[in-house]
Amino acid sequence: MGGAYGIRAIPFVVARSMANDERRALLDATFGVVCESARCSDERRETLEEVIQLAVELAREGREGRKIGTLFVVGDVDNVLEQSRSLLLDPLYGHPSDVLHVGRPELRETIKEFAQLDGAFVLDDNGTFVSAGRFVDVDVNAPENFFPGLGTRHAAAASISRTTGAISIAVSQSSVVRVFAAGKLRAEIIPELFLLSKERLFTPTPEIRELPEAGVTLAVAGDEAA
């Protein structure tokens, strides 16, 4: 599927100077449909929207002039940690939880730096980062974890969302953000107009939503793909 949707590319910005209620309303208006498709609980919704925004920023901006691929896993922390292992000394270990919330602007810049390292980020339902640099165990004999044309990061995202209650958000080096829940690809977020003519969409029976005010296009799985 390609670039015949007439999407206008407008920079995606949710200003940090906004009043919190206004900012939350804008995030929900932009990504609420993704949360609904992922069957996200109310208590996890705000966290998921914040993480998706961070993922879109990474997809759009990259880091130090190059594209970045990474993975965020939200919720069911105990099971996620049990089904993953550290690839390196955890750069988030030992920091107080109040400085590790995804909504903190200074932390978001730190996370963007750490995203250049291998491994996944793990957050709890409240939006606190609990670990970074995690290698997610993937059952290589489960074909449902693999999508032709997508790599091991997306297999890990599908697998961990299938075997735990977590929702996973994968950022590809081609600048597309994909959201997985219950082992299924629930949405793709395309942050730039030119990508629509280059990227194949993998979301089953997608509903395409244009959000020109946010500068993104959403491909959200249809009900029959639930």
Feature locations, PLM:
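Divalent-cation
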Residues: 11-226
